Amino acid sequence: MRHRKKGKKIGRTASHRKRTLQSLSNALIENKSITTTVAKAKALRPFVEPLITRAKEDTQHNRREVFRHLQSNDAIDELFGEVSERVGDRPGGYTRIIKLGQRSGDGAELALIELVDYNDVPPADTGQGGSGGTRRGSGKGRRTSTEEEQADASSSGDSSDEESESVEEDEATAEEASADAEQGEAEEEEESEEDNT
């Protein structure tokens, strides 16, 4: 019977799987986010979250239990020091998995797994398609058609100012170029007069 055998196999033997999850956990704790395959990210989440929960209470017993899984003093110090302070008031759900698409070499589905409390900066709006928010957005921050028209009108006004500035700059450079050309012609005439005399 397969009782108490929770977890994904991820195509590895038990010892290989244990070391893979250990290595991924150490990297996640030390770097706060890692890029890996979706299957490994999904297997890593239930492995690392109980360790983070144990790290909230810094006792010798908890340190030994976590060390049993991680086998890295640097990761233990980071987990019980900085990470446990950040997640102290969070009741669970310390990690987030974001799918990134396929890897170009073998087509494997990639994912970014990160510690939630370390992603304070929201992603910058690139202005390229999409709603600009999360997929689970409730639609509260979306623009109405009148707001979009006002934004378009203000941006077209800005572009006309930019166009007039660029026209003025072009005229100034044209005047400088013509002045340089006249000066060059005057110098050539002086040289030709000197040659004639």
UniProtKB/Swiss-Prot annotation:
GO terms for biological process: translation. Disulfide bonds: none annotated. One of its GO terms (cellular component) is cytosolic large ribosomal subunit. Residues 120-197 are annotated as: Disordered. Residues 127-136 have a biased composition (Gly residues). The keyword Kinase does not apply. Keywords: Ribonucleoprotein, Ribosomal protein. GO terms for molecular function: structural constituent of ribosome. Residues 159-197 have a biased composition (Acidic residues). InterPro entries: Ribosomal_bL17, Ribosomal_bL17_CS, Ribosomal_bL17_sf. The keyword Membrane does not apply. It holds the Pfam family Ribosomal_L17. NCBIfam families: L17. Part of the 50S ribosomal subunit. Contacts protein L32. HAMAP family: Ribosomal_bL17. Belongs to the bacterial ribosomal protein bL17 family. This is Large ribosomal subunit protein bL17. It comes from Salinibacter ruber (strain DSM 13855 / M31). The lineage of its organism: Bacteria, Pseudomonadati, Rhodothermota, Rhodothermia, Rhodothermales. The gene is rplQ.
